[in-house]
Curated annotation (Swiss-Prot):
Gene3D superfamilies: 3.30.420.100
GO CC terms, sorted: cytosolic large ribosomal subunit
Function of the molecule: This is one of the proteins that bind and probably mediate the attachment of the 5S RNA into the large ribosomal subunit, where it forms part of the central protuberance.
Name this polypeptide is given: Large ribosomal subunit protein uL18
Ribosomal protein among keywords: yes
Upper lineage: Bacteria, Bacillati, Chloroflexota, Chloroflexia, Chloroflexales
Gene: rplR
Biological process (GO), any one: translation
SUPFAM superfamilies, per the entry: Translational machinery components
UniProt-recorded Gene Ontology molecular function terms: 5S rRNA binding; structural constituent of ribosome
Organism: Roseiflexus castenholzii (strain DSM 13941 / HLO8)
Keywords from the UniProt entry: Ribonucleoprotein, Ribosomal protein, RNA-binding, rRNA-binding
Length: 121
């Protein structure tokens, strides 16, 4: 029996969660992806397959404020930015999709910052 890689296990967890979690126009899905260097967050309406708001550490607007910060601090900045952008579009309540990642560290920091920014999970 072949050993599964951590990426395969994460994708398997993500598929299992996605069977049950779906974004609607009233309560879209806040989807998070974490790479070794960056973190990305999108607010998605799954009924039409449209991204309503997005924020990441690769954006030029956020990059200036991220210099010299740790990855967890960067996740907090992205969480605050996604909350601000979602509220600007009129979104108050979301379903959190952690993307198969553990709810710990950078994922938790992003979620907490989004909650502090006014999003309800």
């Amino acid at each position: 029996m072949a050993q599964r890689t951590p990426r395969e296990l994460r994708l398997r967890r993500h598929r299992r969660v996605r069977k049950k979690v779906s974004g609607t126009p009233q309560r879209p899905r806040l989807c998070v992806f974490r790479s070794n260097m960056h973190i990305y967050a999108q607010v998605i309406d799954d009924t039409v397959g449209r991204t309503l708001a997005a924020a990441s550490t690769v954006e030029p607007e956020l990059r200036a404020s991220l210099a010299g910060k740790t990855k967890t601090e960067r996740a907090k900045v992205v969480g605050a930015a996604i909350a601000e952008r979602a509220r600007a579009v009129g979104i108050e309540c979301v379903v959190f999709d952690r993307g198969g990642f553990k709810y710990h560290g950078r994922i938790q920091a992003l979620a907490d910052a989004a909650r502090e920014g006014g999003l309800k999970f």
